[in-house]
């Protein structure tokens, strides 16, 4: 039995080493191969910098983020929510890189992958069907999952959609939503999973070029 948390983030750019920060975290819970509605996690975060051109990707403006809590104000609640769970993330090095960077800025030596088991759904998709497209929109078309609400990137919406995609990739689900059930267990017998190595923090996800927005858009076309 294992509890799965499907996680996504939105950020101001593609490289935390260049000062980019998280602006949104969204999580959806899966228990016993059912997506639960009553235990999601969703938080907008004040990045302490301008959003810049990345607003074209996610539609989140500086004005909207005014007054939102800083990462240091939500970190305890967030870590309590995910602690001990198995995280499902599409292109895990990107989100983990940002989350671990935020933890470091907070003054913590913790890393997400030291607290949670990681499943990279992007790598799983590549193993299942090499040579095809593996971004979220393509996977929705492959598994006939409705993504019509996805007009821009959004952490919670993308986590909700990825939860459906992941279950379809790994054998389907018993019920789409269960608002009654939320526990610490998830049965993953006979599932093929791809786990991210412990040294994932050393992986460089995307190399930024002179045209940051173009790179940002090209990167997100894969996820």
Regions found by a protein language model. Give the residues of each.
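Acidic two-metal-ion nuclease catalytic site recognized across multiple nuclease folds
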Residues: 168-223
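Catalytic subdomain that performs nucleotidyl-dependent activation
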Residues: 115-133
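Alpha-helical structural motif
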Residues: 50, 74, 95, 117, ...
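Short, well-ordered coil↔helix boundary/capping segments
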Residues: 130, 153-156, 210
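Acidic, Mg2+-coordinating catalytic module of metal-dependent nucleases/exonucleases
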Residues: 86-92, 98, 135-191
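Conserved non-catalytic scaffold segment of RNase H-like nuclease domains
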Residues: 1-115, 126, 138-152
